[in-house]
């Protein structure tokens, strides 16, 4: 027994330790349950959150607006973000950065960089010598990359979300344009890393919009495919997307709605910003014409004036969307000269005529990539702020040939809502209704490599090969494996973009490098030397195009295989037990597939032999993993494996699902079948087949990024530190401003209070003069030296003033509380006295309170009355300017003491059982009164209210209870006058108590 106890103690300690760890994890998880999304537009961003109790809500910024400008102002000692930075664009346009997302992932010679310089000449862009990208130079000491500026914006968006959610947030889904390539997507991920955000996914903004549309129309989606076109014209670009909605059967959740991106078309520079720039140029021309002959400078040479004109152009574009003409006016545009000019919608449309001609372009691209016609499109829905321009809607309606354009979606917030729904689905803290999302690859990716071939005996040459890895408009996320079968030494291969013929010449120049990565493999020859007796199954490279659309090379392996013959005696008991357990939890995978870490290899289909003449060139060495993504929908059963895979006789379906248990498969070891029956005699006579053993050797990989090198880790660490220092400086600035505002507010409020009657009654003239003089001195100091004062100095000044005014404020506050507190005390004393008087009137036989308890209550009541009268009398003698002796906290203490005594007696009366009356000498109780009715004599005992147990009637000693059930098994019913007929009949059937039974 002692040994058993000793064994149980460690187990109990271990259990408690596990419980503590789980509770700690739950508490930590509850602190970070909220997730957020950032719809990152060119001009503004929308932030949404999901947290327990708050489903999918748009975050309001500090100005209570639902969208925030993507603007940053950087100065030597301060930084502004959002609306504050937008206001600084007029005062300091050089330090105010906008539309910097157009520079992400671009090198200095990119046409987009030159376009940015022409649009915003006030910004100084310098070349980063390490990456050949550009940096903003505010001053020689202030230089920031576009990724760093974007990191500031993302960090600001998180602070807005955390203030709104009232809890920390670290997980986010960020929207990016669908046309972003690999370099641009990696730049956004690096910016999020600088901001300390964990990116759950980079979701395309068109996909997020389509998801938001589908989530709120889930009931309208059925097995019939519905094709919807979304035309999104924002500030910086235009994207047209064709989406197919229908319900599909999934492995995890059965029939669920799905959206599939079928076609995408885009124009990188067509948007509201270009329209505003055209209007700005028109207004600048009008202003110069108005000042012609005054020998004035060109307004285009004044950055502040151009910033004012751009703001007015933005307003004009909005107003002209609803009005035929409008008057543009700016006070003090330049050199204190006001500007005023009339602009009509016709003039605006003439300025942007070539832009409106480009509106149908993305529609045609989307239809072409989807291989659809306009007749197959059921609805065209407008998204984005620039689609509110009437001419855009007119041209688009003519291009699509529909009766009307759909406007049944929030054009500004749809992407943010769809992204936050995806964030909740990806987070482990929420459970949402499944909605399958199948995004599409915009730019195809292929693998290129060179190998030696022998065309003629003795004549060898190099052959260049291309294999498509991810095809255009193919779904992602997706994993692919490519097998190189004819290499036994180290070699290189290249990852590049595929055919980009669908892009125009200008788009190709903006796209940048079409070469992604060069992969150098090391250790291939050593792996062949390590397994000389094994047959090579090729060099397998595993690729992953993740949910964010970012390509990565997971690993490269050299796979070998041989035939091994095992006798039944070679398998030990432990091995059999291990195989059995593995089959139970792993879906019945055979033991030979578990050796040397070959699980992932066994789950993949073998690719056909390299260079097969009877197959297309693109498929000679490419294969896709058999294991689909988690949200992959059910597909038709795969075709019969060929080549080596067919010889293995494996069944990929069984290995994927793991639904077929080990016992249901043919037993290869000659053991009993699932019912325990002996194997068939024919099987016993067959020789045991040899099993295949696979060996996997990891191959070293050296990557050379060709499109745009990522920031080195040391540079990234410096950028993170730079942003943290800026954030800390902003927090210190906010703390200082808060302290200064508190000090200034205290001075003004106290100066006003000194003239109020209730403050003058409790203070002398000398006291008020002392306080007033100190307040005036502090106010003067704040005006003269407050700008250079630190946060500590401001807080010390405030603490000094509060200490000086503490006595005055205390006296006023106490006098405000006296009437309410004294009235409550009087009521409690009166009720307590009445309660005590009633308690003393209770007959001695029924008394539940002892004399000591009642005496104690009486003493407390008397002491409280005496304290109140004495304190009031003493307070009346004191002048109002002195510290009062009647304190509100003392009154509350007296009330609590008295209430505690009363509550004790009330609870005792509530739960005390009545005592039985004493019996007479002959063993009977006193006769009932003569005026008592027969019904009263026959009345049975009813338990008192609040009593937990039912009272039992007292029986005579010589009588016994009849019946098989206890006397208190049923509630007692009232018999006699006043009882119902049913109660009378029930009472008559029971034994009537004698006189001695009555209480």
Swiss-Prot record:
Ranges of Basic and acidic residues composition bias in the record: 611-626, 641-668, 949-962
InterPro entries: ATPase_NBD, Heat_shock_70_CS, HSP70_C_sf, HSP70_peptide-bd_sf, Hsp_70_fam
Modified-residue entries (N6-acetyllysine), positions: 883
GO biological process, one term: response to endoplasmic reticulum stress
A molecular-function term among this protein's GO annotations: ATP-dependent protein folding chaperone
Glycan attachment residues as annotated in the record: 155, 222, 515, 596, 830, 862, 869, 922, 931
Cellular localization per UniProt: Endoplasmic reticulum lumen
Positions occupied by motif Prevents secretion from ER: 996-999
Main location: endoplasmic reticulum
Signal peptide: 1-32
Coiled coil: none
Chain spans, region Disordered: 567-694, 909-999
Residues modified to Phosphoserine: 567
A Pfam short name: HSP70
Gene Ontology CC annotations of this record: endoplasmic reticulum chaperone complex; endoplasmic reticulum lumen; extracellular region; mitochondrion
Biased composition (Low complexity): 669-680
Biased composition (Polar residues): 574-583
Alphabetic keyword roster: Acetylation, ATP-binding, Chaperone, Endoplasmic reticulum, Glycoprotein, Nucleotide-binding, Phosphoprotein, Signal, Stress response
Domain of life of the source: Eukaryota
Quaternary structure, from the entry: Part of a large chaperone multiprotein complex comprising DNAJB11, HSP90B1, HSPA5, HYOU, PDIA2, PDIA4, PDIA6, PPIB, SDF2L1, UGGT1 and very small amounts of ERP29, but not, or at very low levels, CALR nor CANX.
Function: Has a pivotal role in cytoprotective cellular mechanisms triggered by oxygen deprivation. Promotes HSPA5/BiP-mediated ATP nucleotide exchange and thereby activates the unfolded protein response (UPR) pathway in the presence of endoplasmic reticulum stress. May play a role as a molecular chaperone and participate in protein folding.
Membership in a protein family: Belongs to the heat shock protein 70 family.
Record protein name field: Hypoxia up-regulated protein 1
Species this protein is from: Mus musculus (Mouse)
Source organism phylogeny: Eukaryota, Metazoa, Chordata, Craniata, Vertebrata
Gene name per UniProt: Hyou1
